[in-house]
């Protein structure tokens, strides 16, 4: 791994998300699409595109953070299903999607990508969601 390069969030992820906070390894972000409660975990390591690019300790930490975040999101949203994926086809920087799905959402049962146009968050609802998620995740 190359730790000489400073970590920076990919510009596309910066445009498409709202920061929630940091866990030990990952930055937690909220996708700007109110159609779904949709979080991203982005390990704060430079030049990482795959989970296998992380060392074993970091891989284990990422799995702990995925578990922690997914459990918190499921509890907060009472969703029917969680979709968890690290795709990276459009944005090469390693990021893990954790999406709360409901059988009543517009895309169900298909994938969320491109199913419906993104819906802007209501500011008050987003603030409330952020506060509840922070409390569940103990994010600083």
What are the language-model segments listed below?
Residues 1-140:
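HIT superfamily nucleotide-processing domains
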């Amino acid at each position: 791994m190359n730790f000489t390069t400073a970590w920076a969030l990919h510009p596309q992820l910066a445009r498409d998300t709202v920061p929630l906070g940091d866990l030990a390894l990952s930055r937690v972000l909220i996708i700007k699409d109110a159609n779904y409660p949709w979080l991203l975990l982005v390990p704060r390591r430079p030049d990482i595109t795959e989970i296998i690019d992380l060392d074993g300790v970091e891989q284990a930490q990422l799995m702990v953070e995925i578990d922690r975040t997914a459990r918190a999101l499921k509890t907060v949203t009472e969703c029917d299903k969680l979709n968890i994926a690290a795709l990276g086809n459009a944005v090469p920087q390693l990021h893990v999607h954790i999406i709360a799905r409901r059988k009543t959402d517009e895309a169900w049962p298909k994938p969320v990508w491109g199913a419906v146009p993104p819906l802007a968050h209501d500011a008050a609802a987003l603030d409330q969601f952020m506060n509840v998620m922070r409390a569940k995740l103990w994010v600083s």
